Amino acid sequence: MAGINSILQTFEGLGEGDRAETIKVLSDMMREGTPRQPAKKKVNGFMGYRSYYSSMFSQLPQKERSPILTTLWQQDPFHKEWDFMCAVYSAIRDQLAEQNVTLQTWIQFAVTPLGIAPRTGYMEALGWVLTRLDDGTHTLQRMDVPDIRYHLQPMNGLGLFLSCLNGGLPIFDPQNIISQLSDPAFDVICINTQVPKIPGTFDTMSGFRQLAKQNPALAMSSLFQLPDTDPLIAQGVGMYEFHSVVSQPVQNHGMPPTTVPPMESHSHEDNMDFAKINEAELDAILTMYDTNTNGYIDPNKPQGF
């Protein structure tokens, strides 16, 4: 109240012209509202690289550490992988921050599916030796230039995220991130590596298959862009006998519990264990979704023409 009274007293002491001008200024200020926060700067590959490998030289002063990391980066064979990893991080940084996942945590789980050399053994793997000179400073020497074998197939942002998720990335609610990376607008975030000498397994589909084996409800939810509480998800999981995962009826925001279609009785040994489904079986399941009716095709019913 004291603030309001002060404003009123100020207005009472103003002339008509000054009062009108003051009201206009205040109105413009209110219309502008709170200034928008500037967009966060995107993390580039070198920033991620430096963040990850800097701890290898924690015993060195900053004036030595920076040029060493710059030299290593210039000769690092994984520039495209680092740029890609950090581009994906920048795209989902806000969602990751909401779940307390930092850049360091993201990198920790992303280096493995991208085939990037880990901190442990990095110098040896790429043929580098750090030598201490007589004056106490340090210099880099490269004793060998190894033949790097690329194990990575082309991957998009969703494929990398699924691989990190399967590797243990601590995300308790991945649905929003999966939905965002499934948007065609983010499909440009992709990587095309050199043709690998040894075929890799960390493409998008293999990452999705692994997620489906661990959490079929979440996998179907991300595939069909529906909340994992939607009755359709329980129908799809239940129809194909994923009993070990869906043990309780799904509630749909006040609607009656979803009824899973009745199935023939099987012994515990005969029940289909989703973790043992091979890729051909999973592919067959994924093709059972009818996009025209937004429902699953019951494989036991004859289909009309």
UniProtKB/Swiss-Prot annotation:
GO CC, any one term: nucleus
The record's annotation in InterPro entries points to:
MATalpha_HMGbox
The listed locations are:
Nucleus
Q: Which domain of life is it from?
A: Eukaryota
One Gene Ontology biological process: positive regulation of mating-type specific transcription, DNA-templated
Cite a single Pfam family from the UniProt record.
Answer: MATalpha_HMGbox
Q: Which UniProt keywords apply?
A: DNA-binding, Fertilization, Nucleus, Transcription, Transcription regulation
This entry's Gene Ontology molecular function terms read: DNA binding, bending
Please list the residue ranges the record marks as binding DNA. Answer: 38-93
Q: Which sequence ranges form a coiled-coil region, renumbered to this chain?
A: none
Which family, according to the similarity comment?
Belongs to the MATALPHA1 family.
Role of this protein: Controls fertilization, probably by determining the mating type. May be involved in the post-fertilization steps of the sexual cycle besides mat+. It is required for the developmental events that occur in the female organ after fertilization.
Q: What is this protein called?
A: Mat- sexual cell fertilization-promoting factor
Protein's organism: Podospora anserina
